[in-house]
Curated annotation (Swiss-Prot):
The keyword Repeat applies. This is Antigen GM6. Residues 1-22 are annotated as: Disordered. Signal peptide: none annotated. It is found in: Cytoplasm, Cytoskeleton. Keywords: Cytoplasm, Cytoskeleton, Repeat. Its main location: cytoplasm. The gene is GM6. It comes from Trypanosoma brucei gambiense. One of its GO terms (cellular component) is cytoplasm. Sequence repeats lie at residues 1-68, 69-136, 137-148. Disulfide bonds: none annotated.
Length: 148
């Protein structure tokens, strides 16, 4: 029998910049239902059920991204939602290397020892907020330069 981790190789390992392991997919009813159906279809007739299996894999991947967006927005609640008047969603923080590096360090420190690492976590949150404001200023100046 396949272990859950073995049968998830088709999933994006870092949806929305969040490691799959942090999404607790086994506890998500919708994901578990799709995963169980996929498992049965594979056991029954992998080739004959290939189309439905592929559809399920796409749906499971999309659902993991939805869960990751929720997790990412929760984990970013300390950020100013409108730095420089620009919505956070427009800043593409997941694609920014500096922000992603700080976010990953923050995530590790929280997982390791939230209280013991509180000072460093707070420093990172301030730096992440400042960086989101820098990105927003760049975005705002870019959009103004295109207007006549």
């Amino acid at each position: 029998k396949l272990k859950a981790s073995d049968s998830r190789s088709f999933l994006d390992p870092m949806p929305e910049g969040v490691p799959l392991s942090e999404l607790e997919l086994d506890k998500d009813e919708k994901f578990s239902t799709m995963e169980e159906e996929r498992r049965k279809l594979i056991a029954e007739d992998r080739e004959g059920n290939a189309t439905r299996i592929a559809e399920l894999e796409v749906a499971m991947n999309e659902h993991s991204h939805e869960l990751a967006k929720l997790k990412a927005s929760d984990s970013r609640s300390f950020l100013d939602p409108m730095p420089e008047g620009v919505p956070l969603s427009e800043l593409e923080l997941d694609k920014d290397e500096k922000f992603s590096t700080m976010e990953e360090e923050r995530r590790k420190l929280i997982a390791e020892d939230r209280e013991g690492n509180a000072a460093r976590i707070a420093e990172l949150e301030v730096a992440m907020n400042e960086h989101s404001h820098e990105l927003a200023k760049l975005k705002a100046s870019d959009s103004r330069s295109f207007q006549s």
